[in-house]
């Protein structure tokens, strides 16, 4: 009897362990199927970013009211009907000018804003306040230390603002989104002083950085960029804007820390897809060294020629396969290594492989 009981207990133990292991691997497998996308939308001189995960749509900023048609066209192309959370990083019109129009056209369930607001109100703020009130939308105010939920298992940590300022840019919400082993840092329009203050408080290391203030010369401090150490940098900026964004020296500085630099004025909308382990990037266009623009290239890769590095036969510069400045196909030469490219007299592109 004792022998039978011992055997029965052994079988039960094996069964429990087997079920636990199978459940564990099933959970991992299901997690890998849950892809997250982050799209930095081309809205001209402004900023708008769409996060999609588990059927939820989270919109960070909306761009200018005058550029709203670009945002709406993109949202409709993604079959967006409702927005679970519209986050307004700060009150500049190039970040929230279209917010009331988003509420008009889509079912917005929540609006998140910074806890600290400057006293001065512009026309867009008044329109947004009215739209929130008229549609009885829930609101949330966040500051450093707050959390913003995207969906089950994924949230954003808020790093700023930590105190009130009379300057809108300094009140920008700074957030870090984590999805498995991948991370994104959103910076609004913060300046170098706030960037350096964040360095003292947080681990900023991220895979993707939305460059602060459209690449303004008042942001992107060296120390900050070195701590973020982003493989990908994205500049939300409008072509021919009157502010000179992005500053040339900022772009060069980014090249010291990022492998790939994307600009919405040249690359159009930039979309990252994360499975929790890997990141894929897709752009609307590829901006080329020779001034040509290749439309709808799909995912940027070197598959056509089988090489990891892509050279421009006209400039004798070679790029990484995901660079945002690849030449058009007829001007490409493929290489298996940087050394291979250099043996043919090519030099590395400073913003992607020439680090």
Region spans (language model):
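Accessible peptide chain termini
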Residues: 1, 307-308, 320
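Non-globular, low-confidence helical/coil segments that flank catalytic cores
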Residues: 2-304, 325, 331, 343, ...
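SH3-family beta-barrel domains
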Residues: 299-316
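Short aromatic-glycine-(Arg/Gly/Cys) micro-motifs in beta-strand/loop hairpins
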Residues: 312-328
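A short, charged, amphipathic alpha-helix used as a generic interaction element across diverse proteins
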Residues: 336-348
